[in-house]
Amino acid sequence: MLIDAGENKAGNPRHVSPNPNASRTPGEWIVDYIKTMAPVQKQKLDYALITHFHSDHMGGVLKMKNESGRYYNTGIITVAENLQIGMLVDRGFPDYNFLVNTEDKMIKNYFNFLHFTKRKMNVEQFVPGVDNQFRLLYDSTRYA
């Protein structure tokens, strides 16, 4: 499970330099780390959770479009473009009818990404207080 995958422009007060260096974007480093640490037979994420819609949690650098040209690769989008995600969970899907500036370029980019990738992965709204939204998918009886 991945919780948040942000990316900010240098100069943004929330910007943190990519580690180990700036030769890749933060999303690319996240993918590299997961692929390095995950078992070879399990090179994917079961869940990714976006806690809220700030660039340091979902990505806000809008400079490199994906192959289709329909949205920019940044943060969680870069992760999803390079690693299979079984379920993406955020706090507003599908109607986003709470305090979200739907005219914000970063939010529009995220919506475009969801629209054009909806057949590739499941997307679901986070439900506070439930204990079954994120289930152990492998050998769960071992942890019962």
Question: Which residues make up each language-model segment?
Answer:
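Solvent-exposed loop/turn segments at secondary-structure junctions
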Residues: E7-A10, H52-H57, F93-N97
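Divalent metal-coordination and catalytic microenvironments
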Residues: D4, H52, L88
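Conserved beta-strand hairpin/beta-sheet module of binuclear metal-dependent hydrolase folds
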Residues: M1-K44
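Flexible, acidic/histidine-containing loops and adjacent segments that form or flank the divalent-metal
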Residues: Y33-T36, V40-Y47, M58-A144
